[in-house]
Structure formats: C-alpha cells, structure tokens
Amino acid sequence: MPSNARVRMSDSETGGHAFPPGFSWPLWEQPRHFELGHILNSAVTDALPPRRVGALGVHHCGLWECDLRDQSLVWSGGAYDIFGLSRGSPITRQQAVAHYSEHSRARLENLRAYAIRRKRGFTLDVEIRAAAVGDRRWVRVIGAPVCEGDAVVRLHGVKLIV
C-alpha cells in the first residue's frame, strides 16, 4: 500500500464519529510518525524541569506506553508535564483519560479500539484539562500497537502539545 493511502473506517468501527483521513496508518510507517517525538523528547530534554526547557516547552512532548494486559501506564517526564502532573506520580489509565474532554475521550476510545483490532498506528488531536494549571490544551496523540506474535500486547507512542 502506498504511504499516502488512507484507510476508510465504517461507522460501526468509528462509533459514528467521522475521522479525517490520516488518523490510521500501517505499522510499517511508524518511524515516520514517531520521528518528531524522538527529536523533541531526547533524554536531556526529558530530564530538565519544564521551566528549564525554554521555548521547547511550548511544543513539549512526552512518550507513553500502555500494557493492554492490565492497562498500566508508563510515561516519560514530558507526558506528566503535558497533563500538569508531578513527574513519576502514580497514574492509572482511568485517571489519565479523565483529563480528556468528553468528545475527545470518545474519539480516542474508538480509535484506540480500532488500532488494537486492526493492528494499525493512529494519530489524533485531543483536548485535555491540565491538572496543575487548570487550563485546556490541545495534544496530538500518536500511537502504535506493539505485537507479540499475532497479539497486540501494548500501545506506545508520543503526546505533543499542539
């Protein structure tokens, strides 16, 4: 399939929500979709407190992973910063998705289920409420399944303030 090909999801797969083209992509395109996050979230940037990141803080990003066996999350420091949470504090998936606006949460859950079922990466812009600062912000969530054999066991990706 060419890299510019788009997947069309049925209403039953999207929960009736219309996803713009490009939200779902094949796993072989993962390096292209993750490149920005790896550039912006180097070990040096992630180790710095947000105030020391400077202008990069406006476009700060974080890495995330969700183990599908128990829904446990692993976040980099940048992911905590985006949500306005203390770095390293315990966070459950249920607590994390509570930060999403209702509309964004519904779209994320539908696209996440599709990505797991079809073994495809995804990109989605969502609105969240950052805890410490109390403001709403838009975040681009880029994710892809991690497979062991034919089974998807984890999702991992990048969150980027947009």
Where do the language-model regions lie?
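Hydrophobic pocket-lining residues within nucleotide cofactor-binding pockets
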Residues: 68, 146, 162
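PAS-family sensory domains
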Residues: 2-30, 34-36, 80-156
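PAS-family sensory domain signal
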Residues: 40-99, 138
